[in-house]
Amino acid sequence: MTQTPVDYKQTVRTPKTDFPMRANASTREVEIQRFWEEQGIYGRLAQENPGEIFILHDGPPYANGELHVGHALNKILKDIINRYQLLQGRRVRYVPGWDCHGLPIELKVLQDLSQAERSQLTPLDVRTRARDFAQRTVQSQCASYKRFGVWGDWDHPYLTLQPEYEAAQLGVFGKMALKGYIYRGLKPVHWSPSSQTALAEAELEYPTKDDGSPAHTSRSVYVKFPLISIAAPETATVMAAELLPRLSAFHDREEELIDALLGERDDLPEIAVAIWTTTPWTLPGNLAVALNGELDYALVASDEHGLLIVAAELVERLAGTLATRFETIATFRGRELEGSLLAHPLFRRTSPIVLGDHVTTESGTGAVHTAPGHGSEDFELAQRYNLGVLSPVDDYGRFTREADSDRRENLPVFAGKAVLSDGNQAVIEALSAAGALLKEEAYVHKYPYDWRTKKPTIFRATTQWFASVSDFRPQALSAIAQTEWIPASGENRITAMVAGRNDWCISRQRAWGLPIPAFYCENCANVLLTQESVEAVQAAVRVHGSDIWWQKEASELLPPGIACAHCGGTAFRKEKDIMDVWFDSGSSWAGVLGRRPELHYPADVYLEGSDQHRGWFQSSLLTCVATEGTAPYKTVITHGFTLDEHGRKMSKSLGNVVDPKLVIDGGANQKQHPAYGADVLRLWVASVDYTSDQLVGPSVLAQIAEVYRKIRNTARYLLGSLNDFVPERDLVAFDSLGEVDQYLLHRLSVVHLEVTQAFESYQFSRFFQTIQNFCVADLSNFYLDISKDRLYISAEVSLRRRSCQTVLYRVLESLTRLIAPVLPHLAEDIWQHLPYPRSDASVFEAGWPVDHSQWFQPLTVDRWPGLIVLRDRVNIALEAARNAKRIGSSLEAKIRLHVEDPALTDELARQKDELRYLFIVSQVELLDELPAEVSVEEGAAVIVLDADGQKCERCWNYSVHVGEDAEHPTLCERCVSALAGAF
């Protein structure tokens, strides 16, 4: 009777799972997001988790334009933190926000209108258009953020245009005003002629070239201010003594020369103080020249330029600049020249010499032209010396008629000319015509531009509203010191900014924003800004929104019977200025954290780009410290900026912009623009050191996608290998596991600890490195490789197989949750494909993995690294034999092995029966001594021989026992035993 052939392939237990090999992210991720939304996973966890409330307060992005990869970096970082906190059992409260007021949106809605059309718009017209634009942008950006996989209260975001938010902001303003921190005054501020409004420091940018060097070029000039008189007689006497031998007109008449220097005669020889400025257009506003009282100044002579006074330290440098040779006649301390009078080169007025610590010898002449209406340091000097303020420039950056007042004869007219173009040229021409121009040259340097119009700004003195930072600066610095800053350098950065900043200009001359709730008496122009008046406006805005300010008259907004405290008048007009948008967003701790149920401040975390040290971090700090005496945050985390793969800024002109939508959903040409999905983008975020600038581009994303693929394939193999495993039935106790199994669980416990520490310390790149190494080195290249024999060949319910499955189960359960904060879609997809029942509908309901401290096995750790290194040596030898065509599969080989390390020799002897599985060969022999022709390299010798015996049809191992079993003549002894359920 002929025996029916057995199909042994059917007895091999290969992995089986319906978890797809390909992610199909563009469709599968959307399905998973729909599942989360339909099941209400985020909302349920946020409400029902047993832990404390965790608040990461969202810094509001601007509701203007499409999202770029920098937005993705920011929101994904926040989501990683929030998802980890949810898995830890905390009740996360994440309210997304948008900054909706301000100039960029106003300009956007006006850009397509003609000047005539713009002039017809009322403030309410502008506001309606701006509001509609902002709300449309919010809807668009909201959808994109959700597609990134970001969880939050998307149905109830905060918008700075919401009436309840605006009312809270007015409350902050009112508290600051009542404490005396808000005032109105004339000061130089950053002014944008292109936008016709004051700007905060955070609304400026400083253009750079691709190499990071400044991209702005100014026309700098060296100018002579003729000396009229010396203030100090002692100085005049010394100067006269040194000058007398050189002046034939005063031969032997020293007393007369002294009198001339003191201004008591009109025959003073031509002496001038030389100044240098990069803003010639500010010279019509000059009211003084500043020296440093502690610097030495030299009176020098040259054939080309006569007698000049410059910093002694700069004489040689200036001689080169002016292409001349200087002879030093006398030197004086700057303080000895204080109060001396100079003639303005263009106007019939004098400019006194004043002293200022800001004057240095780093550049220029050591003498600084001082225009109090065009610089903060100049303004402070003017206050000290009672110089007054002159700023003959209008809102559009053009000279006013005041710029021509007392102008010397035969000089060009300045009025009406733009100070940054033809006005600047006119001043330079006037200096030349007056004989005061020593030199003009181009000067490349940092220069502030309007962040939205991308055009240069100016310093201009105007009447504005200010927050007096100096009044609460010490408290702000103390609050900074009590905050955790990540990276730590952030503390030094914001400390220096707050310590050195001027008062905060909070008013803007536009329509789209929250009004400054001040009124002016029609009779005496006195300002009305009281608790009663602010609360009345606040109440109206809370109900009707800030449009009410433009819809109602002052009398309709103010409480009945209110009167001017100065004159008793009862008629008032409204302030026209609105608040700085940084005051808007800087009040979010009050408008969101202080108003919504279960929210509070200080928040646990603020996280934004490093530019927000001068922006939102600072404005939030100042408003909160001023009103509450504390910082609004406990921890502040900053990230850098996204650059292309070559470290360049992204721009459409360079064609190097990375569009997150294109990364996620792909392009028309999928080969050129693959649909990577949100998780690959998220994995990139976790892979970089976000505290510095990050590189991203096609090759970077391709590398990240490969890491994602390896993690996914690892998970797929784990799922497939557990297709017949029921944890409640099949789990093997730790003590009953084999040593390699215990070692792998030890490694899992270490990975669990390292990943937890990475998330706790916000060092997400450590997560990336740890998970990548675990999936590749520990699992794919080691444990999963050596476990295939047990999983495929052994009897289904054997201890050998169930032990391995127990480890895979533990790994899958932990790994899925460990990756969930960064790769939520992949983690959820794995969870939904678990081959055994789970009570948790979502991986996020399962919580963070439990720390199994009993898995930590130091003894096992000491043994296995040496074995793994030896395994690598064996693999190298096998690969060499394979390349030499001596073997095909490693199972065709027998290994003879000798090591010189006694401890490792003992370990090999102890593990002798398991070595064939460790090396994936058919036989292993340990040699006490080596043949003479074999040498030891790096402490070991590996000899590759042909395996003994015949190839088993079922497991493909070679064995001398193949054919011994009559029922299964083509099988080895292991497979015969496995089919009988005994191996």
Curated annotation (Swiss-Prot):
SUPFAM superfamilies to which the protein is assigned, alphabetical: Anticodon-binding domain of a subclass of class I aminoacyl-tRNA synthetases, Nucleotidylyl transferase, ValRS/IleRS/LeuRS editing domain
Motif, 'HIGH' region: chain positions: 61-71
GO molecular function annotation: aminoacyl-tRNA deacylase activity; ATP binding; isoleucine-tRNA ligase activity; tRNA binding; zinc ion binding
Binding site for L-isoleucyl-5'-AMP: 608
Cofactor(s) needed for function: Zn(2+)
Keyword Protease included in the entry's annotation: no
Cofactor: record remark: Binds 1 zinc ion per subunit.
Residues binding Zn(2+), per UniProt: 952, 955, 972, 975
Principal location listed in the UniProt entry: cytoplasm
CDD domains associated with the record: Anticodon_Ia_Ile_BEm, IleRS_core
GO biological process, any: isoleucyl-tRNA aminoacylation
EC number(s) recorded for this UniProt protein: 6.1.1.5
Chain span(s) of sequence motif 'KMSKS' region: 649-653
UniProt-annotated location(s): Cytoplasm
Notes on the domains: IleRS has two distinct active sites: one for aminoacylation and one for editing. The misactivated valine is translocated from the active site to the editing site, which sterically excludes the correctly activated isoleucine. The single editing site contains two valyl binding pockets, one specific for each substrate (Val-AMP or Val-tRNA(Ile)).
Function, in words: Catalyzes the attachment of isoleucine to tRNA(Ile). As IleRS can inadvertently accommodate and process structurally similar amino acids such as valine, to avoid such errors it has two additional distinct tRNA(Ile)-dependent editing activities. One activity is designated as 'pretransfer' editing and involves the hydrolysis of activated Val-AMP. The other activity is designated 'posttransfer' editing and involves deacylation of mischarged Val-tRNA(Ile).
Name assigned to this protein: Isoleucine--tRNA ligase
Species in which this protein is naturally found: Gloeobacter violaceus (strain ATCC 29082 / PCC 7421)
Gene designation per UniProt: ileS
